[in-house]
Regions:
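C-terminal outer-membrane/trafficking sorting elements
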Residues: 234-282
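Surface-exposed repetitive/solenoidal architectures
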Residues: 1-233
Length: 282
């Protein structure tokens, strides 16, 4: 979707769909991805390229967008790449291959890559060359990057003066590093959701999902104070006074924000007798 002559500039809403068994095998071609070339104004949302897919190209390739070009803002939101990406030349990534001539402003939000990226220079897990005005938010990588000519430890994304907010990579150093245990046990999912379980973007059915996903049919991750779980069995409070006569003296969210009333999700409740309870409101 999108070519050099006719780059995509619309709004694509994937509605959380997953693309399976997409194979692109052309080592003579560039500008390769689910979207080949996009330009300012393009918004790519909520689609995942499944691990059953594979891309092999010459250069400027990624699972979601091969190339951005021209001025304007390009937004890639809620997208995941699980496919392996191999290019014989430069500029490959899981989400974006290259911001050509670094003219576009690129925002990547709530995205992830778990595929292996094999390429030459200016390649990395989330994006090849991003330019100097990009922002990447709430995004993670667990895929292996095998790229020659890496600039130091820039395995997450390539670019200068780019802004990375709440981003994570497996055993990396460009953004916050996480271990394989943190990926599988739910901690990474909880971190991506801002250390809260009320208004979440990432989901993970523990014991089944090897990494956080964007699929709402999977389970929410909670922190019970000692470990990450999908279900909580909190104490119930029917009123502001319990059977011992203790009253509620304070209510906080799990992140520590004081609240006036119980909110949907998990609440930390302090009683007048000094006890503290977790209360789940559905």
């Amino acid at each position: 979707i999108g070519t050099v002559d006719y780059p995509y500039a619309g709004v694509f809403e994937g509605n959380g769909h997953r693309i399976l068994n997409l194979t692109i095998d052309n080592d003579a071609a560039g500008n390769i991805g689910l979207f080949g070339v996009v330009t300012g104004g393009a918004k790519i949302r909520n689609v995942v390229l499944d691990a059953s897919s594979y891309i092999y190209a010459k250069a400027w390739a990624a699972g979601i967008v091969g190339t951005t070009k021209n001025d304007g803002l390009v937004e890639i939101t809620g997208c995941g790449n699980e496919a392996d990406i191999t290019v014989t030349g430069a500029n490959a990534g899981g989400i974006l291959g290259v911001n050509d001539q670094q003219t576009a402003m690129v925002y990547i939000t709530n995205c992830y890559n778990t595929g292996a990226i094999t390429a030459q220079r200016e390649s990395a897990a989330i994006s090849g060359w991003l330019g100097n005005r990009a922002k990447v938010v709430n995004t993670y990588n667990t895929g292996i990057v095998a790229a020659t000519g890496l600039d130091g430890n820039l395995t997450f994304a390539r670019g200068t003066n780019c802004e990375y907010i709440n981003c994570y990579e497996l055993d990396g150093s460009q953004v916050t590093a996480v271990t394989s245990n943190q990926v599988t046990d739910g901690e990474l999912c909880y971190l991506l959701n801002g250390k809260q379980s009320d208004d979440v973007v990432f989901f993970q059915t523990l014991g089944e999902d090897s990494h956080p996903v964007l699929d709402k049919t999977h389970k929410v991750v909670y922190f019970d104070g000692t470990k990450y779980v999908n279900e909580l069995l909190p104490d119930a409070i029917e009123s502001t006074t319990d059977t011992t006569g203790a009253t509620v003296t304070g209510i906080w969210s799990l992140s520590g924000m004081k609240q006036n009333t119980l909110q949907k999700g998990i609440n930390v409740v302090k009683m007048s007798d000094g006890t503290v309870r977790k209360v789940l409101v559905k």
